[in-house]
Structures are given as C-alpha cells and as structure tokens.
Regions:
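Terminal alpha-helical segments
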Residues: 1-126
Length: 126
C-alpha cells in the first residue's frame, strides 16, 4: 500500500469517530451501532499507521490481530484492551439485548478511540 493512503484512511477513521459521537447522543440509536463506529475508528486508525509504516495490513476486523503487527514498545493508548471493541464489528452487530451497554461504557469507548486518533495523528506527522 502506498504511504499516502494512510492519510486518506485516517480521515475516514476521524469521520467514523465523529459519526459515533453524533450517534451516542441519540437515544433512538442502538449503543451497539455507536460502538461499531467507534471500533471502525480505532481499526482504521491502526491500519493507517501500519500503512504509513509500510507494514502489511491484515484483512481483519480483529483488533488483537492488527495490534500484533506493532512493536510491543510502540502500542497505541489502551494497548491490547482495545480488542474489547472487536465484537462490535462482528457478532454484536447482529445481536440485540444479550448484553446491556451503559452510557458510561459508550463514553469510555469514545474517549479511548479519541486517544487512538490523537496517537495516530502524531504518528502520521513524523
């Protein structure tokens, strides 16, 4: 992948985060839908950094698998705990009511993703 694509992918990640932020304020939207966009923001941010570093990007939504491509000493904020978002890009999109999410959990996820976005922005400017 071309290094320039990293910036394009990062813009999409930022938009996913903004979408999640807007969705989080609407009580008629499933929290799982909001967290899907949070997960996408994190996933695309990580993939943008890999692209920038010219490391092959795995074709997966599994944040753990994506994180394994990074040096252990250069993980994004949240590290491997970001993997907790992975189910929102897969099975949790197709289930309703098996696990009740709180507003605080959504807020925490948004904050975690924002830290990843900030980390990515710095990485792409180096």
């Amino acid at each position: 992948m071309k290094k320039e694509y990293a910036h394009e992918l990062f813009k999409i990640a930022e938009n996913d985060w903004l979408t999640a932020e807007v969705l989080s304020k609407n009580l008629n939207i499933r929290k799982e839908t909001t967290l899907f966009n949070v997960e996408q923001s994190v996933e695309k941010s990580l993939k943008a950094v890999l692209c920038y570093l010219q490391i092959p990007i795995p074709f997966t939504h599994d944040i753990y698998a994506i994180m394994q491509k990074f040096d252990e000493n250069d993980l994004p904020p949240g590290g491997y705990s970001l993997h907790d978002l992975t189910p929102f890009a897969s099975i949790r999109r197709y289930e309703e009511g098996k696990y009740i999410l709180t507003d605080e959990e959504v807020s925490q996820a948004l904050r975690a993703a924002k830290l990843v976005l900030d980390w990515t922005r710095k990485k792409l400017s180096q």
